[in-house]
Curated annotation (Swiss-Prot):
Name assigned to this protein: GTPase Obg
GO MF terms held by the record: GTP binding; GTPase activity; magnesium ion binding
UniProt domain OBG-type G: residue ranges: 160-327
Residues the record lists as binding GTP: 166-173, 191-195, 212-215, 279-282, 308-310
Membership in a protein family: Belongs to the TRAFAC class OBG-HflX-like GTPase superfamily. OBG GTPase family.
Domain of life: Bacteria
Domain Obg: 1-159
CDD domains in the cross-refs: Obg
Alphabetized InterPro entries for the sequence: G_OBG, GTP-bd, GTP-bd_Obg/CgtA, GTP1-OBG_CS, GTP1_OBG_dom, GTP1_OBG_dom_sf, OBG_GTPase, P-loop_NTPase
Pfam families reported in the protein's UniProt record: GTP1_OBG, MMR_HSR1
Subunit organization: Monomer.
Major localization listed first in the record, in broad terms: cytoplasm
Organism: Brucella canis (strain ATCC 23365 / NCTC 10854 / RM-666)
Length: 341
């Protein structure tokens, strides 16, 4: 399935049904009074988060959505039926924005969460409503109210517990494939990964979701390369795993480039807990390994983990560290929610 994380769509709620002009028609009742019913309300437009989706690709092929018009009122004071609603089914993590693509309407973060984007028009009054002391047989009824028309943006920010960041070819996709059942495209050239991939990692009876973000380069926050578009997918993560390839001549600079982009992007990414790891260490001799670990430690201010997806060196240790931070974050979140209650 192709990945799409942004879509512009046009929605319109249904018009209300027209009220009816009707009079009682009964045997032995020569002048029956008015009995025109009201029109039904127009259908609403809703957005709802469903399980099993991680792309907005369906909205590439259909951009216009219109709810049904309410049924017209009928005689015998019968109100018309409500028009059918339209429900936009989206992945968990979808945000809805106004036409300017900046004003947030709602943030859909849980399966089953619904939000009404456009309310259907009210039905028109039937002629029964227009009876007065001087007009006992009104021949007038209201048309239904017009529906609401809006242009909106859907923007998906994947919900993952851990995010993988690093320069192109840092080994992010290889790591994801090694510790989860995900099957990202892997090749020996930059920008092999063109969209985020998700995988579920398991360690010591615990499981969490990891997001692999396409490689960043210097200037990504200004739109260079793939730009910073995909950084939005790690905004919701609890921890970042920053991979620095052992193939880099200057591992300190490689680390600093990504840190600079995280800080330039803002939105709290630079403040997230970070685990730094030197990847592809199976390609180094002991002396070179020692030198690169020392340089990276100096740059990041902590002892980097050593990783190799080929020899599986350090994989379990890395997962345990990620799980520990994620557990702490979840516990803190649960404590905050409990305190608010």
């Amino acid at each position: 399935m192709k990945f799409l994380d942004q879509a512009k769509i046009y929605i319109r709620s249904g018009n209300g049904g027209a009220g009816a002009v009707s009079f009682r028609r009964e045997k032995f009742l020569e002048f029956g009074g008015p009995d025109g019913g009201d029109g039904g309300r127009g259908g609403d437009v809703w957005v709802e988060a469903v399980d099993g989706l991680n792309t907005l690709i369906d909205y590439r092929y259909q951009q216009h959505f219109k709810a049904k018009t309410g049924m017209h009122g009928m005689g015998r004071n019968m109100t018309g039926g409500k028009g059918d609603d339209v429900v936009l089914r989206v992945p968990v993590g979808t945000q809805i924005f106004e036409e300017d693509n900046e004003t947030l309407i709602c943030d859909i973060t849980e399966v089953g969460q619904r939000y009404r984007l456009a309310k259907g028009g009210n039905g028109g009054f039937g002629n029964l409503h227009f009876t007065t002391s001087t007009n006992r047989a009104p021949r007038r009824a209201n048309p239904g109210q017009e529906g609401i028309e809006r242009t909106i943006w859907l923007r998906l920010k994947l919900i993952a517990d851990a995010g993988l960041v690093g320069l192109p070819n840092a080994g992010k996709s290889t790591f994801l494939a090694s510790v989860t059942a995900a099957k990202p495209k892997i090749a020996d050239y930059p920008f092999t990964t063109l969209h985020p991939n998700l995988g579920v990692a398991r360690i010591d009876g615990r499981e969490f979701v990891i997001a692999d973000i396409p490689g960043l380069i210097e200037g990504a926050s200004e739109g260079v390369g793939l730009g910073d578009r995909f950084l939005g997918h790690v905004e919701r993560t609890r921890v970042l795993l920053h991979l620095v390839s052992a193939q880099e001549e200057d591992v300190a600079k490689a680390y600093q480039v990504i840190r600079g982009e995280l800080e330039a992007y803002e939105h709290g990414l630079a403040d997230k807990p970070e685990i730094v790891a030197l990847s592809q260490v199976d390609t180094l001799d002991p002396e070179t390994r020692k030198a690169k670990v020392k340089a990276l430690k100096k740059a990041c201010g902590c002892e980097p983990l050593l990783l190799s997806a080929v020899s599986h060196e350090g994989l379990n240790d890395t997962l345990r560290q990620l799980a520990r931070i994620i557990d702490l974050s979840r516990a803190e979140e649960a404590g905050t929610a409990q305190a608010e209650e």
